[in-house]
Amino acid sequence: FNSFPTNICFKKGMIKMAGNTLENMDKSSFSPMMQKYLETKEKYKDCILFYRLGDFYEMFFDDAITASRELEITLTGKDCGQAERAPMAGIPHHAAEVYAAKLIEKGYKVAICEQLEDPKTAKGIVERGVIRILTPGTIVESNLLEEKKNNYIMCICKTGLYFGISVCDISTGEFYSSEIKGENNFETLLDEIARFSPSEIIANSMMFECQEEMDKIRERFSIYMSRFSDKFFSDEVGNLQLDYNILENKKEIGNLKERTLVVKSINALLEYLNETQMTSLEHINTINIYNLSKYMALDINARRNLEITEKMRDKSKKGTLLWVLDQTSTSMGGRLLRRWLNDPLLDVKEINERLDAVSELKDNMMLRGDVVDTLKKVYDIERLSAKMTYGNANARDMITLRNSLEKLPEVKNILSTCMSPKLKQLYEDLDELQDVYELINKSIIDDPPMTIKDGGIIKLGYNAEIDKLKTATTEGKNWIVKLEAEEKEKTGIKNLKVGYNKVFGYYIEVSKSFVSQVPDRFIRKQTLTTGERYITEELKNLEGQILGAEEKVVNLEYEEFVKIREQIAKNVKRLQKTANVVSTLDVLSAFAQVAEDMNYCKPVVTDNGKIKIKDGRHPVIEKMVGIGNFVPNDTYLDKDGDRLAIITGPNMAGKSTYMRQVALITLMAQVGCFVPATEAEIGVVDKIFTRVGASDDLSMGQSTFMVEMMEVATILKEATENSLVILDEIGRGTSTYDGLSIAWAVAEYIADKEKCGAKTLFATHYHELIELADKQEGIKNYSIAVKEKGEDIIFLRKIVEGGTDESYGIHVARLAGVPKVVTKRANEILTSLERKSMLSGKKQENKKVVEGQFDMFNYKLGEIAHEIDKINLNELTPIDALNTLLKIKEKMK
């Protein structure tokens, strides 16, 4: 912070300094405690340091100023050995997670500095050290994470034109890596960022030095980004085996040696996680090296326009494809569903295996019901197992894990009756983890406390020494009860009672009215407003025995709990594999339930290049309006036949909805889900492109039309004959003739098998384009049916063969509530324009575009024709005729 915030109110005598001033000061002039703080802060300059002092985390100097502003907490001061106090702000230690989350959300990193020794036994200043750094991509606390969404951190290694990427969710242990080489590398990188939607990105210096690329990432995504030292981007494969124990066999090592960029990104990301987490990363035990060609390519625009997992406007889930399909019963299943929707498959065999499993679950209502009922009682095994390896799982987490593992035999039994290959494989892969279940069940009590350092966790019968000490404690407390009865009898004080608190220990309490009866052997310990508290030698001896045993029990229980947690952590790979089985079954079951509820059909998925849909519906809109209220439509596209469908019709008639519907049905089929149609045959699509609408990108200095043309250019470069392209009203951002020319040329290019040949839905308001169907093979005209009733129109929402040259724009304006006087005037203007258009020959049927002759789009013809029409031949002299002809010739130049 180079300048001091104006909204911070300083108290008199407080140091007014920014970081650069502090650096210039002599550190030895500060108090011993503050010197220790400054030593720690020096190592974590890029973080806000939460410095533990007793029951609070304190922040000093610039950190305090920032925290006071961002967290809206009081800025105060602390004596620091200087003439003036250091700015200070503090938060209660038990609320640290909440405050840290707020700072992270605002783009800060937070370093947690804990007391590493008991202040009671410390000699001198308490030893403190940073135990963890919190960043947006390294959060593991369940209450700070979305249950059904991964929290990814991405590492990018740029070398020349190529990229190596690694992505990890440390809350689950998932780790993915890939290499981006070939054409359009940066666009592919953007697509991968959109696919994973990380909350944090780290990258090497070469990436940060490319300002144009960094600006594009920042403008398209709201992601925390930071540069990580190049020295950690090592290409040593051995590190992964020796330091992290991730690679298990020589084949994996050999495969990685050929992928230098991948190895560099993996090493850097693991090092970053080590630096920030400072704990075991054993739950990250497998690196999934994925090939981009395994999945359907969906660029940023396609993901946004199709609203697959989030709404375009408010980023919410409701109103998306995910919202329609998410009937998962577990958090793990919800996260896997999101990943599947982001990664539609290309392998026909794998797709059909999923579809067959969904079909079996859909057709067997009892089977599906058993799956749902059982999985509803299974918690987040994936994140729970990660917490075990992290060492931050408490006893309640263990019981939650135990309760989940208890249901695995039921899941295994359900799967044993299944016949489809996918479900059979899940049966084979499911590890019931009975040994882990038994370990927790016999060691941890059923309803343990939240804290793990106060005892009351370990079951009787698990540890003999703990049992012995607990017995001694119980007997001691029985002696206390006996002592109370004896003292009442000896003293005659009937309301005498023996009590205990953590500050004063055990005591005998006597009310004021009986203080005169207290014997001399009672030693006063504490005076109350209502009476006195005493201690006796006998009670003191009992207290020593009881508290000594209790302290030993608490310490032993904690030690035993840690051992149990470590034992569970050793099984993390088994737990993760089982979590994957459960989540896969959960998603397949959700697909089956949606298919049953919404009357979806099983698509026939092939590689024949056809998209044939009968009575297709838009899945999201159908759910919103209700079954039976959505008008279905057919679709036929064939890479060897009708590749490009030109769709004309009025605005608001449903063109955009129809095109998105086809794209979503195709995507759903390749995810392995049933689709909203009565029949569907889907030839696998390698990429889906969408050019739907446009909005000015003023931050990049690009107009609507420029953005549109850039998107079209990308489509023309990257689309193949196996792609699906959605083009909605291209060419609107420029003049009519420019727009029509571009739309015409784009349609010609895409329809040409030699140049592109992608299956395309092309909605347009340029009715001239319907002529293309007669001029070029592979193009067919469609339109949205409209019923006219007097001055009104009814949108039938039905796609029919054949083009239309009616736009019904004024009718739409009337429906939208435009004042009648305006629509009436618009009709008058339209009539006038149509008359002029007829004179200029614009509506002649079967117009030909012949190279070398007049351009069909030359607007001068209309003006000249109108001039000729005004000439009165009866009054025109030969000289006038020649002059008029010269003017016309001049205009034709």
What are these regions (language model features)?
Residues 13-360, 369, 373-389, 393-485, ...:
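Charged catalytic and DNA/RNA-contacting regions of genome-maintenance
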Residues 61-62, 259, 329-330, 334, ...:
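ATPase nucleotide-binding head domains, primarily ABC-like/P-loop NTPase cores
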Residues 113, 136-145, 280, 419-422, ...:
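Active-site phosphate-binding and catalytic loops of NTP-dependent enzymes
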Residues 193, 198-206, 538-571, 675-677, ...:
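Conserved catalytic alpha/beta cores of large enzymes that bind or transform nucleotide phosphates
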Residues 233-241, 296-297, 312, 403-478, ...:
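Amphipathic heptad-repeat alpha-helical coiled-coil/stalk segments that mediate oligomerization
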Residues 351-354, 374, 378, 472, ...:
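Intracellular alpha-helical coupling/juxtamembrane segments of multi-pass membrane proteins
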Residues 394-397, 873-893:
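Short, amphipathic C-terminal "tail helix"
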